């Protein structure tokens, strides 16, 4: 079988770079963070420029953490400054390097998600100048995989030179630089980009390109730590591995030889993928990814509330989310027969002594290691496959009432429609079987079902009319009474993309 060559490209601090270019600033020389300051200092930073990261700032930290770190860095600069005094400030890294008397400053740019999507589309068009769409996987708004196996001979270029050519074209077209990884499979090009490229010096344009094959992967990364640097190894996986004496991918590979059963006991069928990756193997190709059709589909959404919500207001928000979910189903021609809801509780439930004293349930740790009440999770089955707004909203409200602890403050909500299928292929009530008995008036039951079918058909017409209006005049062209209630979020979220300002 012909050995394949893959390139992964990650646009450097994409959102932040776009904001710099729009201000005619150099992304590599500007201290800038993309964050919605209107949401308070606890808001998550969507992107941070490389120069600002150089002060020890995380790319996905909170805004208050950025401000605190800059404050600490300025305290150090003041201590070292002539006369121990800072005069003036700058957000340009070069000026700060030249003048030790300047205080570090930075720009806070509010997110513009629709604009970033436009930029991403322009960059994808650059990629298509070199590689056909069927050989490209769009992994995220700022990251792609390419199978360039059949293009190297055409361009008479090495994988490194082709990657550089594409990246420089993107740089010329948009002013945004990138990092690339090259590998003999999708996994290797990804970890080459994520891990190896980060540890090599950038060229004058900020470009880093790293290459791996199976043998160089084992030589270079079998001893690398932490495990969470590797693609698809999260904190939970890493913790389990470390508890069993495996601290590196080399440890995992060796254990797969001596005690493979342990890995399957720990991770089930997912152990196969982990073992493959430990050895640098990945059988999946771009072609296979493109051809993949999942056995079951789901459609859902989630949101982090901007402040802790009492249960009644959180229930309102969940009903709004169910309303939007039903309209998404109608728009896509899908139906569902099951909903799943997850409710995440706020840390204040345990930090407030009065609330803490009333809570006697299970306590877990969140992503930051803080104690919070364990989330609530539940499923409700619908009587039939449907995209009815009324049926889905009523079911979501019923499920919320069943699983939510009404005494706790709520911070996160997720709702998912599972068993999603095309409406045309969905089983109907006529296709199902039921046990007959002597005490049911089946004529009345059939009349009721017929009336319900008519009501659902009428509702579908209303839903489709609403979708037409919303697409033409915007999502807020039609609002319901609940959307104007205190605590409702749909109106604001309709003006967002991915939960951030459009």
Name each model feature, range by range.
Residues 18, 369-502:
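Acidic, metal-coordinating catalytic segment for phosphate/diphosphate chemistry
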Residues 184-187, 276-279, 335-347, 409-422, ...:
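A glycine-rich phosphate-binding loop feature that marks nucleotide/adenosyl-phosphate handling sites
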């Amino acid at each position: 079988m012909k050995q394949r060559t893959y390139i992964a490209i990650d646009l450097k601090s994409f959102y932040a770079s776009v904001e710099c270019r729009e201000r005619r600033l150099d992304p590599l020389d500007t201290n800038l963070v993309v964050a919605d300051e209107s949401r308070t200092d606890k808001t998550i930073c969507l992107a941070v420029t490389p120069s600002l990261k150089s002060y020890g700032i995380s790319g996905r930290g909170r805004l208050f953490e950025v401000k605190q770190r800059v404050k600490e860095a300025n305290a150090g600069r003041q201590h070292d400054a002539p006369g121990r005094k800072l005069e003036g400030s700058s957000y340009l890294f070069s000026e700060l390097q030249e003048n030790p008397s300047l205080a570090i400053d930075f720009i806070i740019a509010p997110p513009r998600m629709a604009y970033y999507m436009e930029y991403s589309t322009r960059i994808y068009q650059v990629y298509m100048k070199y590689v056909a769409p069927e050989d490209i996987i769009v992994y995220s708004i700022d990251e792609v995989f390419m199978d360039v196996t059949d293009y190297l001979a055409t361009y008479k270029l090495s994988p490194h030179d082709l990657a550089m050519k594409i990246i420089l074209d993107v740089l010329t077209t948009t002013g945004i630089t990138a990092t690339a990884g090259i590998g003999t499979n999708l996994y290797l090009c990804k970890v080459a980009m994520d891990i190896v490229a980060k540890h090599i010096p950038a060229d004058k344009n900020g470009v880093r390109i790293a290459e791996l094959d199976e043998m160089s992967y084992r030589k270079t990364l079998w001893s690398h730590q932490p495990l969470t640097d590797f693609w698809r190894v999260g904190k939970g996986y890493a913790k389990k591995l470390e508890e069993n004496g495996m601290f590196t991918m080399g440890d995992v590979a060796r254990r797969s030889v001596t005690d493979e059963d342990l890995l399957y006991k720990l991770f089930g069928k997912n152990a196969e993928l982990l073992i493959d990756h430990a050895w640098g193997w990945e059988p999946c190709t771009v072609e296979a990814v493109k051809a993949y059709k999942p056995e079951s589909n789901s459609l859902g959404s989630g949101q982090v509330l901007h402040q802790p919500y009492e249960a009644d207001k959180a229930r309102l928000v969940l009903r709004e989310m169910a309303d939007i979910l039903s309209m998404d189903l109608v728009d896509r021609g899908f139906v569902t027969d099951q909903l799943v809801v997850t409710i995440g509780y706020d840390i204040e439930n345990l930090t407030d002594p009065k609330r803490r004293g009333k809570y006697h349930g299970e306590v877990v740790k969140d992503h930051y290691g803080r104690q919070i009440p364990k989330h609530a999770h539940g499923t409700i089955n619908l009587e039939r496959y449907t995209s009815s707004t009324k049926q889905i909203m009523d079911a979501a409200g019923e499920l919320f009432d069943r699983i939510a602890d009404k005494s706790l403050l709520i911070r996160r909500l997720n709702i998912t429609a599972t068993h999603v299928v095309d409406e045309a292929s969905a089983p109907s009530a006529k296709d199902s079987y039921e046990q007959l008995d002597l005490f049911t008036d089946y004529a009345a039951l059939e009349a009721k079902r017929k009336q319900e079918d008519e009501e659902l058909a009428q509702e579908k017409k209303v839903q489709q009319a609403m979708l037409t209006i919303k697409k033409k005049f915007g999502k807020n062209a039609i609002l319901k009474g609940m959307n104007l209630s205190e605590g409702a979020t749909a109106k604001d979220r309709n003006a967002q993309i991915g939960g951030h300002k459009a």
